Amino acid sequence: MTSTTSFTRADGRAQDQMRTVKITRGFTTNPAGSVLIEFGNTRVMCTASVELGVPRFKRDSGEGWLTAEYAMLPAATAERNRRESMAGKVKGRTHEISRLIGRSLRAAVDLSQLGENTIAIDCDVLQADGGTRTAAITGAYVALADAIRVLKEQGVVPGDPLLPPVAAVSVGLIDGQPCLDLPYEEDVRADVDMNVVMTESGEFVEIQGTGEETTFTRAQLNEMLDIAEKGCRELVHAQKAALGI
């Protein structure tokens, strides 16, 4: 169990306070949906591209599909990382985050209303300062909404596939205190690290939580989930404001 000591965040935020969040739509012009999302100094480009047809396992189902890929640019971190494509092997962490983004965004789309079309989500980290996967999920929803709007305008989709927003945020225990939206310097020293994905209605899509340095109690888990819920509500508000809804 974590002991409680005094902890003050380096950036001066309250424990349950998000970093400044900025969502810029139309960041690039080629994809149907393109967004730059910023959580403080973390910056992720999220795009949504439309591909006619579906994977083999979805053919003749009448349903669409959504897939996602995640990557970090070499200079996204303080020390340059070699491109995984050049190394000839995609890291397990990259696969895990790609799958997480895909699962999360599939909770925000009714595949039965998409027709046999595929939406490919690409999330590229331009600058990493903690919370890259949660920023990616949050920004990708806005890109997804724009892509579906294009599909509807073109008469490609038979129904209204977009579901209410899905957002994600990190939370952790630092010196026994729950903190929301961890930057890198907090993430590396956190006793417990969690990522929480939620719908607008407050339902959980996914919870990833690990006692990095110690165990944690049910009460501490509840505290972390409470501030994560607060953060996700604020992020949904930011998503809807960006989309003008």
UniProtKB/Swiss-Prot annotation:
Catalytic activity: tRNA(n+1) + phosphate = tRNA(n) + a ribonucleoside 5'-diphosphate
Enzymatic class: transferase
The keyword Transmembrane belongs to this UniProt entry's keyword annotation: no
Pfam families in the record: RNase_PH, RNase_PH_C
BP GO terms, sorted: rRNA catabolic process; rRNA processing; tRNA processing
Positions with a binding annotation for phosphate: 93, 131-133
SUPFAM superfamilies, alphabetized: Ribonuclease PH domain 2-like, Ribosomal protein S5 domain 2-like
Record-listed E.C. numbers: 2.7.7.56
Keywords, ordered alphabetically: Nucleotidyltransferase, RNA-binding, rRNA processing, Transferase, tRNA processing, tRNA-binding
UniProt entry tagged with the keyword rRNA-binding: no
Family: Belongs to the RNase PH family.
Function: Phosphorolytic 3'-5' exoribonuclease that plays an important role in tRNA 3'-end maturation. Removes nucleotide residues following the 3'-CCA terminus of tRNAs; can also add nucleotides to the ends of RNA molecules by using nucleoside diphosphates as substrates, but this may not be physiologically important. Probably plays a role in initiation of 16S rRNA degradation (leading to ribosome degradation) during starvation.
Name used for this protein in its record: Ribonuclease PH
Organism for this UniProt entry: Corynebacterium efficiens (strain DSM 44549 / YS-314 / AJ 12310 / JCM 11189 / NBRC 100395)
Species lineage: Bacteria, Bacillati, Actinomycetota, Actinomycetes, Mycobacteriales
